[in-house]
């Protein structure tokens, strides 16, 4: 084997194993981007989130990635095929996509709140149906339009044959809001799991007070038969509570989105000690996720980094795919 080959090639030569990316974001594709509320804002202007996408712009061939985008036609040529290309480059079998439906609180300059909407039907058509065996998804749900509307959002996800829903507290409010409880009850009835964001957020109008993982304690207590996936494990927010949630509740799992190789050098993020804690106390309840395309420039490097950490091979395989396959009861079609 050539010494020039990377970690992924060496893994493939020794044992056939495919990564499952449990957390990625569709909707930022150039085609029809203004039809999906909030999605153009990821590229437009000089906001924190737009600046965070400049690396992706460079990798996607933008000749001026640090310029300010003002019009949709200036967006990079980003497509569903781009997802598949990056997945293939990083030995990723499949990816779980996050459909989003949320509205922030009012804030100065926007009395109606900022809206973010990636429709279930769009993701099903452009990703799941177009690339069989490569994608699954969760449907966006929020309580801003009332209890019954939230229940109908759950039903929409079920009708799209999604395995679960996503609550995005920065654009939806507290996840233990009683107005969401009928939606959780409907998920139990239909056999859907619930994913809840607990990381920090830099999008317009979002408020940090809603995203602390402490509020998932209520949901897990009140719905012990509901499978809950805690997204981001409270990173930059309350990671210790995130860890405790998974230890305390049999029905609560977590991902480690985003395992950025540089940020993982610091204790304020997820350093090696954090990952080894997960390996020791909850090796079967943690999933690998990337927030792609936010992580596009380091998409392959993230896999290399995890696979090179001083962790057992058994745990690496659980973390990088086997745990999430079991969680979804996923039947691989590409192996």
Annotate each predicted stretch with a short phrase.
Residues 86-93, 126-135, 222-226, 280-281:
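A structural motif corresponding to the C-terminal end of an alpha-helix
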Residues 1-20, 31-86, 93, 155, ...:
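Mid-to-C-terminal alpha-helical segments outside catalytic/metal-binding sites
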Residues 80-84, 120-128, 153-154, 180, ...:
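Generic structural signal for well-ordered alpha-helices
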Residues 160-164, 172-287, 332-334:
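Catalytic pocket-lining loop regions of alpha/beta-barrel enzymes
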Residues 23-29, 197, 232:
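Histidine-centered divalent metal-coordination motifs
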Residues 93, 99-202, 206-207:
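Active-site gating/metal-coordination segments in enzymes
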Residues 19-22, 97-98, 138-139, 166, ...:
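Active-site neighborhood of phospho(di)ester-bond hydrolases with catalytic His/Asp-centered motifs
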Residues 23, 87, 123, 165, ...:
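Conserved, mostly hydrophobic/aromatic
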